[in-house]
Amino acid sequence: MDEKTIEKIKKEAEEIINKFSEVLEKFNLEMEESYYIIDTRNVLREDEAVESNPEFREKFLKIAPKVNKEGYVVVEKGSWLK
């Protein structure tokens, strides 16, 4: 690259950094850290353990295309994961 092009790139990079700095100055960084973006979470129900229905499990496993020896349904790997 010639000197003129290098100087142009430097000038443009400096302008970008300055503009970025101006935008950052507008953010309120004095707020409390939080994990969730909104205060409400899981508003539909409480998480709780549910008893399984052995009869349902037995019927489900009978109609499943493939079940391993531990009694879990074996599913095909997604074609997008090749």
UniProtKB/Swiss-Prot annotation:
InterPro entries: Asp/Glu-ADT_sf_sub_c (IPR036113), GatC (IPR003837), Glu-ADT_subunit_C_archaea (IPR010120)
Keywords noted in UniProt: ATP-binding, Ligase, Nucleotide-binding, Protein biosynthesis
Reactions mediated catalytically: L-glutamyl-tRNA(Gln) + L-glutamine + ATP + H2O = L-glutaminyl-tRNA(Gln) + L-glutamate + ADP + phosphate + H(+); L-aspartyl-tRNA(Asn) + L-glutamine + ATP + H2O = L-asparaginyl-tRNA(Asn) + L-glutamate + ADP + phosphate + 2 H(+)
Keyword Ribonucleoprotein: no
EC number: 6.3.5.-
Molecular function GO labels: asparaginyl-tRNA synthase (glutamine-hydrolyzing) activity; ATP binding; glutaminyl-tRNA synthase (glutamine-hydrolyzing) activity
Gene Ontology biological process terms, A to Z: regulation of translational fidelity; translation
Keyword flag Ribosomal protein: no
Summary of the function given for this chain in its UniProt record: Allows the formation of correctly charged Asn-tRNA(Asn) or Gln-tRNA(Gln) through the transamidation of misacylated Asp-tRNA(Asn) or Glu-tRNA(Gln) in organisms which lack either or both of asparaginyl-tRNA or glutaminyl-tRNA synthetases. The reaction takes place in the presence of glutamine and ATP through an activated phospho-Asp-tRNA(Asn) or phospho-Glu-tRNA(Gln).
NCBIfam families noted in UniProt: gatC_rel, PRK00034.3-1
Subunit note: Heterotrimer of A, B and C subunits.
Family statement drawn from the similarity comment of this UniProt entry: Belongs to the GatC family.
Protein name, entry field: Probable glutamyl-tRNA(Gln) amidotransferase subunit C
Natural source organism: Methanocaldococcus jannaschii (strain ATCC 43067 / DSM 2661 / JAL-1 / JCM 10045 / NBRC 100440) (Methanococcus jannaschii)
Lineage: Archaea, Methanobacteriati, Methanobacteriota, Methanomada group, Methanococci
